[in-house]
Design a protein with these regions (language model features):
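N-terminal lobe/hinge region of extracytoplasmic solute-binding protein
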Residues: 114, 119-201, 232
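Detector for C-terminal structural segments
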Residues: 139, 348, 354, 358-365, ...
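Extracellular/periplasmic solute-recognition and catalytic clefts
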Residues: 230, 234-244, 256-258, 355-366, ...
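Ligand-site clamp/hinge motif
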Residues: 211, 228, 339-345, 367, ...
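C-terminal motif of bacterial Sec signal peptides marking the signal peptidase cleavage site
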Residues: 59-62
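Aromatic- and charge-enriched surface segment that lines or borders ligand/interaction sites
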Residues: 188, 195-241, 266-268, 400-403, ...
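Bacterial lipoprotein signal-peptidase II cleavage site
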Residues: 64-72
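Surface-exposed binding/hinge segments that line
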Residues: 246-333, 712
Length: 749
């Protein structure tokens, strides 16, 4: 029960706080609600951290509209205060910007610089000259920085949550090593690991030109043989990759990959594949790179000279069996998955700007500069500028946010909680950092995912697969209240539909943002009654129609994440009990365990991510079950991946989504857009993912950055498909003052 009174905030008091008046709103609420009390367990846990910080910070998170402020403005208050606050808000949401990939070879540098430690190694004869470690001049990756040329040295301090947090490193520190990659707007594929791509007029042949002189992090040259090895001996191995990715084919027909010469490879398809360049830029099985996708045998390239020794067909079964036994693995497949794991194996040759030297299964995950990285700035200085990245494990989300508030991280957005924004604002000067908001176009920063393949309890599973039941759930909870508590009122409550400006937006916000996504307990209760859930027990909870027992739903939720999924789940459960008479419990588990539960289809629901869905065709897993880890049903994703050979047969609407998705890759843009819009129409109507709120910085967009860091964008495109902050090319970050850029000892010196 929530106390009420003149100085008490209740859910009914919450109003939306406009972003342009955020500071004013927070200050007013700090004055109004110093005596705020809330006795619910979820709220108590959520603000537990605040108790050890200032009183103003403690109570500022519950912000409301300007009209809600009870205290009259002082007589001397300037009339232009709102305009002033708008300029303050501009500190947090800046202009979208980022570094540029230079493609005009006339601007490529002809002389080169390197970190002082590497120069010393060259002088000592323990490292080849910089010219020998970089690609030939015409094949360099040249980056035009946001601010200008940087300085070498220093450490980038970050936080991570443990061995399951590999995405932390994938985003910050892999380059990213995609085959192609997005420009800073997230719209245009550009050269990256591949120097360039030629596309035939009929859209069937894609010729990739590699960078002559590029080297793996151990100094061995990268050639087309590494790509062919990946295709034939890893991706083509049925034990390692039993199910081929849909993106390596079109219209159900797999493409053919071949080596043309030492620095040229080619994909050929039977049908036009107009979207293939975007596939190679995105976080897909082909485009996503070795560091991220290599652990599952995907990613388009792999170090042949290193990984061949672990493949029985190349090294011989007896030799590989001995290694498997000596290193304690059960199969060669699990052995090579470890050997090709960027986050776990320091010996792995890679193409990333930093390489793992102390793996992720330690309290500190440590990365060091790659002496053979192929990227330079406009003056020829080899990137990265910063020597080391040190990620320190935080046992939970509260500890990580406390460290960020205290200024212990240099650039961090991952795992930072939107509810702590008042404290970040208050402590900027003391912590020597600046706060940035990186908003995104996804309609649901977080969504309530329904497992349509749930069979642990067939009665409940059938309810979950009933669209009417999902519609009733969507009308059973107050999104506005969740928005105020977990988004500070800055999100857009409603369905999972992407922002109106998105290419694939299904239509007007007035229709698709609210469709099946407005709190309407009368409607919800009527639907539940019609579904045979009209009987209740003495406590007012609905009873199952099959056995007369109480209906109990369970939401699986990940702990220690960058949004308060557990708190959201608890509030949704509270609303289900209060407004529609359904008992709901929360199963709060660690991320890796939650992934295992999801993969086994043992969960009924998840409250989890929805970000990235605006990149529909390269990051579809938060829209429908495009894979076995979407949360919507692993068995359905397996059906999609195997073309119906394995898994669970989808409903007719979901099959239509599958068909549209596969067709879209081989049609011109206008037709692809139409297919994408229809996918969203079906997804919103079917409500596999029940939207909560989105289009905000809540998911990895609350960014704190040390004021001494250079080449920092005022706003960056925020999307997992672009591996933000990877889209801002963190290898261009540098420390402006000498106190922070002392040269760091490198393990290979």
């Amino acid at each position: 029960m929530v106390q009420t009174g003149p100085n008490i905030v209740t859910p009914a008091n919450f109003k939306r706080c406009g972003i342009n008046h955020l500071n004013l709103c927070l200050k007013e609420k700090a004055k109004m609600f110093k005596n705020l009390h809330n006795t619910t367990s979820m709220r108590t846990r959520m603000i537990g951290l605040f108790a050890i910080i200032t009183l103003v910070g403690l109570f500022a998170f519950a912000c409301g509209s300007d009209e809600e402020a009870a205290a009259p403005a002082p007589a001397a208050a300037p009339a232009a205060a709102p305009a002033k606050e708008e300029s303050i808000a501009a500190q947090y949401i800046g202009t979208l910007e980022g570094p540029a990939t230079v493609t005009d070879s006339s601007k490529f540098p002809s002389s080169f610089g390197e970190a002082p430690q590497l120069a010393a190694m060259v002088k000592a004869g323990s490292l080849p000259a910089i010219e020998e470690r970089l690609p030939v001049q015409s094949d360099l990756l040249v980056i035009d920085n946001i601010e200008g040329i940087g300085e070498y040295g220093g450490i980038w301090r970050r936080g991570f949550t443990g061995p399951a947090d590999k995405w932390n490193g994938y985003r910050c520190c892999t380059g990213p090593d995609h085959v192609l990659f997005w420009d800073y707007t997230g719209d245009v594929p550009e050269p990256n690991v591949a120097k360039s791509i030629d596309v035939s007029d009929d859209g069937k042949v894609f010729t990739l030109h590699l960078r002559e002189g590029m080297r793996w992090s151990d100094g061995v040259p990268v050639t087309a043989d590494d790509w062919l090895f990946w295709y034939e001996d890893m991706y083509g191995n049925e034990e390692l990759v039993p199910n081929k990715s849909a993106v390596s084919g079109i219209n159900g027909k797999q493409g053919n990959f071949e080596k043309i010469d030492d620095y040229t490879v080619r994909w050929t398809f039977e049908d036009p594949y107009y979207f293939f360049t975007s596939v190679l830029a995105g976080r897909t099985d082909l485009g996503g790179g070795q560091a991220d996708r290599g652990v599952v045998g995907k990613g388009s390239f792999a170090p042949k000279h290193y990984l061949s020794q672990y493949i029985p067909d190349i090294a011989g079964k007896d030799a590989v069996d001995k290694i498997v036994a000596d290193e304690g693995y059960d199969t060669w497949v699990n052995l090579i998955k470890f050997k090709n794991d960027w986050a776990l194996n320091p010996e792995l040759p890679v193409l990333t700007p930093w390489v793992t030297v102390q793996p992720i299964n330690n309290s500190e995950w440590i990365l060091e500069r790659n002496a053979y990285y192929y990227g330079v700035d406009l003056e020829g200085n080899q990137l990265p500028y910063i020597d080391k990245v040190v990620l320190t494990m935080a046992e939970d989300l509260e500890v990580m946010n406390l460290r960020a508030i205290a200024g212990e991280y240099d650039w961090q957005a991952r795992h930072l909680n939107m509810a702590k924004v008042p404290l970040y604002i208050e402590n900027q000067e003391k912590g020597e950092y600046k706060l940035y908001f990186d908003t995104q176009d996804a309609g649901a920063d977080a969504q309530w995912k329904v497992n349509m393949a749930y069979k642990q309890d067939m009665y409940i599973g059938d309810l979950l697969r009933d669209k009417s039941f999902r519609h009733a759930l969507g009308a059973s909870f107050k999104r506005e209240q969740l928005n105020e508590v977990f988004w500070l009122g800055l999100g857009v409550p409603g369905s999972s539909a992407p922002a109106p400006a998105n290419l694939y937006s299904p239509g007007p916000e007035s229709e698709w943002r609210t469709k099946h996504s407005v709190f309407d307990p009368d409607k919800a209760n009527a639907i539940f009654d019609e579904l045979g859930l009209d009987k209740k027990d003495s406590d007012g909870f609905r009873l199952r129609a099959d056995n007369g027992e109480r209906l109990v739903l369970e939401i699986t939720s990940r702990t220690a994440q960058f949004m308060e999924f557990v708190g959201m789940s608890e509030m949704i459960c509270e609303h289900l009990g209060e407004y529609v008479g359904i008992q709901c419990t929360v199963n709060a588990v660690e991320r890796s365990l939650a992934g295992q539960i999801s993969a086994a289809d043992e969960h009924m629901f998840e409250v989890a991510w929805g970000d990235g869905a605006d990149h529909l065709f390269t990051f579809p897993g938060h829209v429908f079950p495009a894979g076995t880890n979407s949360g919507f049903g692993s068995a359905l994703g397996l059906w999609f991946q195997t073309g119906g050979e394995k898994g669970m047969q989808p409903s007719a609407p979901l099959q239509k989504v599958f068909d549209n998705f596969e067709k879209a890759f081989g049609v011109p843009e206008a037709e692809r857009i139409a297919l994408g819009k229809e996918i969203w129409e079906i997804a919103i109507e079917e409500q596999w993912g029940i939207g909560i709120a989105g289009q905000s910085p809540a998911s990895l967009g609350v960014r704190v950055v040390k004021t001494d860091l250079g080449n920092v964008p005022s706003r960056q495109y925020n999307n997992p498909d672009t591996k933000t902050p990877g889209i801002s090319r963190p290898m261009t970050l540098y420390w402006k003052t000498e106190k922070n850029r002392a040269p760091q000892a490198l393990s290979y010196e």
